């Protein structure tokens, strides 16, 4: 279940070396990177590249078709992102590229938690409330004694993600729901922590990659971070804090996600923003949850790319083929209802003209 940092660290390098031979080029979020490529049970096809850049860069690369952001050349065919496409991003894409490239498709890949790894010598049962997370990550409380109501003078050392990270967006969305005067929802931690761009405590550490968060936390007593479930043992309270009494187990994440339904009418199904529910402060289960997503084009000039993307959609969403790998990496497979809705809209559907490669839409359009 637990993939080590060596694999994750090699993903971007592997993408650079092999991108020219790959038929389908993509990249983005580091949160699901080991699920996607580089592990024995990774779910992306062999001819799909995946450059680990973070969600913000991944979205930007796709939205502007800038493959240099993935360290390669040619067309960007897809992206992975835990950060939801904003209204302004969708508007800009539609204005600049929809007429030539065709519509984009944003769909959830798997459900995820954001876990809170820690090192506090002598404490293997840490349980923090959402309010305490606000205190620690805002810097309002600077020692563990202040945070936990003891005399412990150990400094709190926050390990945070630099750059634009979907994991940060998921995490700060929850914090914003609890302490909106201290946190905005943002994919960049230093912009999410208010005031944006404010000075951080000198002992806090910013790291660029998911794979570095846990090792940096473990290196120093008093450290606290946030990271994807793939990087930790989600069942071990000695490794990750409980939040409001709950560990980020698959059962607790499923409870938090509840029974939210996929888009139910044609107008919503045609709206990429409707396909990714967001969660701020679930009423039950683990408190920090969301989805990591794929962004595809509906239309590709290269018919083989369209065929390959369609085949992956059918494999990942058309049954349970990838469920074991998803669970082994600490994520939650989409429910049958969600999978069926995605297949019906973007693979088999014809009446609403949403399917990848639909000739009514893609006759003269396509990502080059």
From Swiss-Prot:
InterPro entries: PBP_domain, Phosphate-bind_PstS. One of its GO terms (molecular function) is alkaline phosphatase activity. It catalyses: a phosphate monoester + H2O = an alcohol + phosphate. It is an enzyme of class 3 (hydrolase). GO terms for cellular component: extracellular region; periplasmic space. Transmembrane segments: none annotated. It is found in: Secreted; Periplasm. Coiled coil: none annotated. Residues 1-23 form the signal peptide. SUPFAM superfamilies: Periplasmic binding protein-like II. Belongs to the PstS family. Homodimer. Has both a phosphomonoesterase and phosphodiesterase activity. This is Alkaline phosphatase L. It comes from Pseudomonas aeruginosa (strain ATCC 15692 / DSM 22644 / CIP 104116 / JCM 14847 / LMG 12228 / 1C / PRS 101 / PAO1). The gene is lapA.
């Amino acid at each position: 279940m637990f993939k080590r940092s060596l694999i994750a660290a090699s993903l971007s390098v592997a993408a650079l070396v092999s991108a020219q031979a790959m038929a389908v080029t993509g990249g983005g979020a580091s949160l699901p990177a080991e699920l996607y490529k580089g592990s024995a049970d990774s779910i992306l096809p062999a001819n799909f590249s995946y450059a680990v850049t973070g969600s913000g860069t991944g979205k930007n690369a796709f939205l502007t078709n800038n493959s240099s952001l993935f360290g390669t050349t040619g067309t960007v065919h897809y992206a992975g992102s835990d950060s939801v496409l904003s209204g302004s991003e969708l508007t800009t894409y539609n204005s600049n590229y929809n007429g030539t490239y065709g519509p984009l498709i944003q769909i959830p890949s798997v459900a995820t938690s954001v876990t809170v790894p820690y090192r506090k010598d002598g404490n293997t049962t840490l349980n923090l409330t959402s309010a305490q997370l606000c205190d620690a990550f805002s810097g309002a409380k600077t020692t563990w004694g202040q945070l936990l109501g003891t005399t412990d003078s150990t400094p709190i050392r926050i390990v945070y993600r630099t750059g634009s990270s979907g994991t940060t967006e998921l995490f700060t969305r929850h914090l914003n729901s609890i302490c909106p005067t201290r946190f905005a929802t943002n994919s960049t931690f230093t912009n999410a922590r208010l005031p944006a761009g404010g000075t951080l405590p000198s002992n806090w550490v910013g790291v660029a990659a998911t794979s570095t968060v846990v090792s940096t936390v473990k290196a120093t007593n008093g450290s606290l971070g946030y990271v994807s479930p793939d990087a930790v043992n989600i069942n071990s309270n000695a490794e990750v804090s409980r939040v409001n009494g709950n560990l980020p187990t698959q059962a607790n994440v499923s409870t938090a996600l509840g029974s939210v339904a996929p888009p139910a009418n044609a107008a919503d199904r045609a709206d990429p923003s409707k396909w990714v529910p967001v969660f701020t402060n679930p009423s039950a289960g683990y408190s920090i949850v969301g989805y990591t997503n794929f962004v595809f084009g509906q239309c590709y000039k290269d018919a083989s790319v369209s065929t390959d993307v369609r085949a992956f959609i059918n494999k990942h969403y058309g049954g349970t083929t990838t469920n074991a790998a998803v669970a082994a990496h600490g994520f939650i497979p989409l429910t049958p209802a969600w999978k069926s809705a995605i297949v019906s809209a973007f693979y088999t559907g014809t009446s609403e003209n949403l399917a990848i490669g639909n000739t009514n839409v893609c006759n003269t359009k396509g990502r080059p």
